[in-house]
Amino acid sequence: MAILTQNLCRYSHTIGFSAQNGRGFNNPVDVAAAPGGRLYVLNRSNIAHAARGILRVSICTIDEEYIDQFTAFGEGDGQIVWPTAIAVDQAVNVYVSDESRHDVQAFDRDGHF
């Protein structure tokens, strides 16, 4: 994890925990930092992991405090197939782009579609 301070980026520490043992990361492809210290980690995982209930967005802090996770594999509203990027705005709305669905979906800070 890098910390941006006055346009300088310095290494702080590595965070992460595997979803193989339940909640955690599985092939993380992007991360977005929100005001207030939350990190939103976008996991690509795969269909087999999705079938086991591994969700696509993990919410944690830089200190590795697990907060929650949201979204599932699928074609419905609030579901994603092949996520490519994640972004957070100042109001802490979370945006996830999906290469397979050709869309960007918006969620609130807690993952509600």
Across the structure, where does each feature detected by a protein language model lie?
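Eukaryotic scaffold repeat domains enriched in small/polar residues
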Residues: 1-113
